[in-house]
């Protein structure tokens, strides 16, 4: 199988890792991919997965899969299973078993107690609204909580009672004692623990207090010996807090945080909240709808792991933002499928053709290559008196430049004979329901003498073809920036009404009858398609269009 032919773009982290290894700062690189299990992974996560696993692979290190499971109210085992499946589908394997931040809850609690004993943390009774008021703004410093000067003994007692479940949700929190006047709002006495009486998918009902992301993340990195903690740029302002915890706790290692620009893809939404809205309101048919930006959606659409990895190589890793053209992703899958997808013929809008001068009862088994370059063998197409062509390939009154079948005109059937249109049969409403044609028996594999036939069209045998459903997927949003809408509008206003067209009664060549789920094809002259992962069955295939043969949006 060929790989997509793309060059790796620059990755500013590669020389940093190389220098750390060369200097002996680290004997081995250890990275991690730390998703929160509160939704399905999307194309933006693919960039982080390829980056973290790719660096570890390139430099002979390891990458951990760690679930940042500190908010049980929004998390679910369903998401954990889906995330693991997506990472494996992309072609990566994490070191050892998957890890959970909840594995470290006991240690994190012990460290929180140490901060209290050192006078660096306190129990605060402010509610969320009061805390926002006290925190200040980007232009105004915050104010100290009235509970900031509680004694160590009182804080230890209250924190123990928080852990014992004596207080309701939100009644108290544990906060670090740093600097309410800091220009970095993240350092204004951030929350370490919240009260949440919620069942946890890993720890059950053991805990009713849960650590914040900021308190959990760096310490989990340290416990696992992470050398390069790589996250997106929105966490750059969190780095001083990340480092404050590491400096003020007896952690076993000192990881370093690096930030890169997240993936912004035009015509695409990756907000978990908005993706969930699309699902919940029925705008799409689930998280794995082939129009979704989720990895499970791309997989069902027919994208290959190799194409997504190639795309991530193409866009590179840097600290500068910007919007990536979705055409680059479509280029990557076209390159992959052009090189690796078997060819086949499928007629989306069948028009019956009767070849009047072809002997009745005669059948020729024509062999066509499964791929023009790779040695994939051949497929057999029975050719007889009755076939189907696509209705769009015949025009009674053709526009200028039309090179397909017209009254009295000739075309070549792909891999077969030249035929001439002699008569169009119509129903009472004037619709063409059948063509009567004649064939030139001397044109199998060669041009007719004395005349030039320009057009080549695809076809399938009438008797042996298999009926199928074809789903023509297109971009879910018609706007390059779907987040932008008219005043008072919503991103939903940008949904493309033609993002899915379902065609039934299509006719596919016989070899497609037993297409396996996720088997990919180039339907000649139509595009790249995949047998649907869920709905396609032997004898009743369902095909999803992955991408058109060419970029029709850029024209």
Swiss-Prot record:
A motif ('HIGH' region) lies at residues 35-45. It is found in: Cytoplasm. Pfam families: tRNA-synt_1c (PF00749), tRNA-synt_1c_C (PF03950), tRNA-synt_1c_C2 (PF20974). GO terms for cellular component: cytosol. One of its GO terms (molecular function) is ATP binding. L-glutamine binds at residues 68, 213. Keywords: Aminoacyl-tRNA synthetase, ATP-binding, Cytoplasm, Ligase, Nucleotide-binding, Protein biosynthesis. The keyword Protein biosynthesis applies. Its EC number is 6.1.1.18. ATP binds at residues 36-38, 42-48, 232, 262-263. The keyword Nucleotide-binding applies. GO terms for biological process: glutaminyl-tRNA aminoacylation; glutamyl-tRNA aminoacylation. A motif ('KMSKS' region) lies at residues 269-273. It catalyses: tRNA(Gln) + L-glutamine + ATP = L-glutaminyl-tRNA(Gln) + AMP + diphosphate. It comes from the Bacteria. CDD domains: GlnRS_core. SUPFAM superfamilies: Nucleotidylyl transferase (SSF52374), Ribosomal protein L25-like (SSF50715). Belongs to the class-I aminoacyl-tRNA synthetase family. Monomer. PANTHER family: GLUTAMATE--TRNA LIGASE, GLUTAMINE-TRNA LIGASE. This is Glutamine--tRNA ligase. It comes from Ectopseudomonas mendocina (strain ymp).
